Swiss-Prot record:
Subunit structure as annotated in this protein's UniProt entry: Component of the ASTRA chromatin remodeling machinery complex.
InterPro entries per record: WD40/YVTN_repeat-like_dom_sf (IPR015943), WD40_repeat_dom_sf (IPR036322)
One GO CC term, this protein: nucleus
Organism: Kluyveromyces lactis (strain ATCC 8585 / CBS 2359 / DSM 70799 / NBRC 1267 / NRRL Y-1140 / WM37) (Yeast)
Tree of life domain: Eukaryota
Location relative to the cell: Nucleus
Protein name (record): ASTRA-associated protein 1
Name of the encoding gene: ASA1
Amino acid sequence: MPFTLRYHTCGVTSLLHWNDEQDVPTLISGDEKGSILVWNLLSRKPYYKYTCRGQIVSFQQLNDLIIATSKDHTLRILKFPSTLTTKEGFPDYSLPELELIYEIPVNTLNFANTAVEQVDTNNYRLWCCNTQDSETIDIYEFDLRDSKSLKRIHRALSLYEVISGLVDPSTMKFDKLGTTMKFIIYEGIIYLGFESGFVIGLRLTQGLHIVYISSANYPEPVLDLTVGKDLGKVISSSTNSSLGLHTPNINTESHNNVSSKDVVVDDSTIHSEMVNIPINKVSHIQQVDNLLIAASWSGRTVVFDINGNKVLASILKERGQVLIDDNPYGNASLPENSTKVKISAMTCIPKFNTVNPSCTSEGTRRRWIRFYKETWCLIGYADGSIKATEVTFDNLITA
């Protein structure tokens, strides 16, 4: 059954499902005021908190670390509270604080997220917007054990000159890539989504390599990037009704391709694979359990089959309720007098076929197993609520 999480007093701006089936089903949420909450989804209560000085922009899970980027121009690395994952929650007045173990100043003027990858046991690499120019990127490395180890290895890296020399000027005309909108890591490649609609894949191995270029969303801005594990692709959304599908050719050699003083281009092909769906202005996109889930500026979330061809259902919050409707075709935009509530964050939780709950309570064990038998979509709204809805429609999916 759908349920609602209520604790935030302002708009929810970021959600992250803690992806570890050995832990109690857990959600991490952040809001406009900088509050971070760790939720037990069985008890439906928060059991840890942390407060930043600005709006939460994004979360990333990296092993047992929570990477939180906020509008106070700071990236914080917090320790996930693994010792208390089976607790039922604490009274509101006594929520314990998450442990802060590292923080880095970053540029969050344009609401772009960040991406952190692990280099070895204690060393990490950060990809983010340049501290002064959001159209260029910085790359840092640091040792998590040493608060003074932060070192910038690439500064104000611009990709425009290289990309503009590869495109056909008769079909694509642009004088810049624009602001960096999104970062995401998949299979060792860092994908950047730009205001111009380009998605570029980078890899740092004995120099910086461009391994993938796509104009699928050109000339509209990239609004979101997500990993489509069932597809083996990265998916991008934009203001139009096209989703970009991104798969680099990792076996491409660089010796016959383009290079500059900053980067080597391993694959100079401009890719444009995409799929069209019957909604536009897709601000949030997720792919889970052979489902494609898209949330639009209209306040409607639509569930598709994995290829985006068949509409299975839609989710809409109106006047404090969530309406589930098999017809997704509504207004393309949100009128001023609309009673729909704006979607401000989304994440999904996949099914787990085999779950071995680490708890002693038989009741908790049953709820744990039952929860993971469903696919869940969790949506954060501008009114501070978080709605959790099952999105398993196996009986409607055709081969």
